[in-house]
Amino acid sequence: MAEIHVLAPIDGTVVPLEEVPDEVFAQKMAGDGVAIDPSGKVAVAPISGELVKLFPGGHAFGIAAAHDVELIVHLGLDTIELQGQGFKNIASEGQHVEPGTPVVEFDRAKVEALGRSVISPVVSSGAGTITRKASGAVRAGQDVLFVIEV
């Protein structure tokens, strides 16, 4: 078995997925993981892989990694409705990324001013089982958010 260490994609405080005020994430319909109440301004790649999906509005991205591991990083809740307000894509879809590669700029104040939650789920939607989850404060590209065993 291999262990994939998924780093925090943005500075902030870990929130258990079950406490996310969105049923799709709270009930793990999109996959297991955790969420972050972000304090940072840039979302980075949490693992090495290919940026297989980068939404034009910048509110979410997906990475395909080794061992069929797939991650979804969703910045805020219902933020697709903002049509890019509060987000700026830095990376490009199809690009290879390493942990810490900047992907999206995030304006927390603007997203909140537009009436959206900034709670940001990070979920594993591919192979493997999450074995350890962080709690407390995490730093983007530095601290392990969770571990996936594949």
Where are these regions (language model features)?
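Contiguous, well-folded functional domains in the mature portion of proteins
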Residues: 1-150
